[in-house]
Amino acid sequence: MNIDFHIKPEIRILGIDDSALLNEKVMIVGAVFRGGDWIDGVLRSEITKDGLDATEVICNMIKKSKHYDQIRTVILDGITYGGFNVVDIQMLYRETGIPVIVVMRSYPDFEKIKSALKYFPDGEERWTIIKRAGKIERIPGEKSPIYIQRAGIGVETVKKIIRLTSIRSNIPEPLRVAHLIATGIILGESRGKA
């Protein structure tokens, strides 16, 4: 069920991104924001590189957080973390009760993804999770569009949240800051784009 709801200017949003893939364990960082310009907290956990634990780890990270009852939306940087550790956004929504928005700078190349998944013994399972994430929708931006998937939230509400939180680029600030923190901690300095 995807619903639209009223957005307050200081809605609590959790943006999640991963760090560089330097080890078997990959750090994921969550930045808790009020709207798009006030950071309220930082969450951290680890997932297995190319594993299948991202959904469970993110669920636990959220549920164990002191911010859990305040978070109204989770924003993910794509659905693959730590290589091909795929997040099941429908399950993440069901387990936490918090709507999920997936943000992508460009439309995914599904043929390339399917080709890469052939090297995984559980590639079909990963592909099923990817398909379960649902339709990819284009959201126009000032300079360039972004692409989204969603669970438990209507597209009009997603557009409002994107507008509210995308204050320095077309990427929502909670996601941009999570990326900066994750790469900065692991690489010693932040780099790349969320």
Curated annotation (Swiss-Prot):
Note the InterPro entries from the entry. Answer: Endo_dU (IPR002802)
At the top level, the lineage of the source is: Archaea
Q: Which family does it belong to?
A: Belongs to the UPF0215 family.
Tell me which NCBIfam families the record gives. PRK00766.1
Protein name in UniProt = UPF0215 protein Mbar_A0619
